[in-house]
């Protein structure tokens, strides 16, 4: 039986049976039938539920005359991403704002939840950054195809010089697959290292001093979230551009 956080144990207590049955039907390996939900999955679920509550509370408290704290936070995040999207994507950026905002809030929340005692940052486990990277990868390719069509989108991979197009096509395909690993490793490595440093100083130095490293962890969390959504916007801009038409 693996070590379980209290929220993981709570979920496994009530959902282990249905989850194990579903994994069996899908032929997914399940080494721990009595605890099929891992810590990072439980933390993702918790973050999702907390964000749902946050946005419901924000929606209920919306006001033109006297916007509350939650509304200011939500509008601030949306305006920041909108400004970044307008600069990097240009015309039509509004179509992708909701995805980038959702992605950024989700990643940032997962980065920060590890600072709360009894919780772990899901992004410190490689499967979670990989999932975010794969969703982003498929998202920008789908919208690239939608904007340019199959032929128009393939031109992005061929370059302007026809006689080296086959070589450029192979290079571009490899570079696009490499983006998955780049997004994954960058987020995972930084959050894993940040968690380890914070835990190490909590155990070695007097109480109070680790607050400095908690501040550093928050800074790293913000930076990594910003880098991830910025790269997502850049990839979207490249995929939806019509420069080779």
UniProtKB/Swiss-Prot annotation:
GO cellular component: plasma membrane; proton-transporting ATP synthase complex
A GO MF label: proton-transporting ATP synthase activity, rotational mechanism
Described function: Key component of the proton channel; it plays a direct role in the translocation of protons across the membrane.
GO BP of this protein: proton motive force-driven plasma membrane ATP synthesis
InterPro entries per UniProt: ATP_syn_F0_a_bact/chloroplast (IPR045082), ATP_synth_F0_asu (IPR000568), ATP_synth_F0_asu_AS (IPR023011), F0_ATP_A_sf (IPR035908)
Keywords (A to Z) from UniProt: ATP synthesis, Cell inner membrane, Cell membrane, CF(0), Hydrogen ion transport, Ion transport, Membrane, Transmembrane, Transmembrane helix, Transport
Chain's gene name: atpB
Protein name: ATP synthase subunit a
Sequence similarity: Belongs to the ATPase A chain family.
Native source organism of the sequence: Koribacter versatilis (strain Ellin345)
């Amino acid at each position: 039986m693996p070590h379980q956080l209290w929220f993981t144990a709570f979920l496994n207590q009530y959902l282990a049976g249905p989850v194990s049955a579903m994994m069996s039907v899908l032929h997914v390996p399940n080494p721990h039938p009595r605890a099929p939900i891992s810590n990072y999955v439980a933390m993702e679920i918790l973050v999702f539920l907390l964000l749902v509550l946050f946005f419901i509370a924000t929606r209920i408290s919306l006001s033109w005359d006297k916007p509350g704290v939650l509304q200011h936070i939500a509008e601030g995040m949306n305006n920041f991403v909108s400004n970044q999207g307008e600069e990097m994507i240009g015309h039509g950026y509004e179509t992708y704002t909701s995805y980038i905002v959702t992605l950024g809030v989700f990643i940032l929340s997962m980065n920060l939840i590890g600072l709360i005692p009894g919780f772990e940052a899901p992004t410190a486990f490689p499967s979670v950054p990989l999932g975010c990277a794969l969703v982003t990868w498929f998202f920008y390719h789908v919208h690239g195809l939608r904007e340019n069509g199959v032929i128009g989108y393939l031109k992005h991979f061929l370059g302007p010089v026809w006689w080296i197009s086959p070589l450029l096509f192979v290079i571009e395909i490899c570079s696009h697959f490499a983006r998955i690993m780049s997004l994954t490793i960058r987020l995972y490595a930084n959050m894993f290292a940040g968690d380890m440093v914070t835990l190490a100083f909590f155990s070695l130095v007097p109480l109070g001093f680790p607050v400095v490293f908690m501040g550093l962890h928050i800074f790293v969390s913000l930076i990594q979230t910003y880098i991830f959504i910025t790269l997502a916007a850049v990839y979207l801009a490249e995929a939806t551009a019509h420069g080779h038409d």
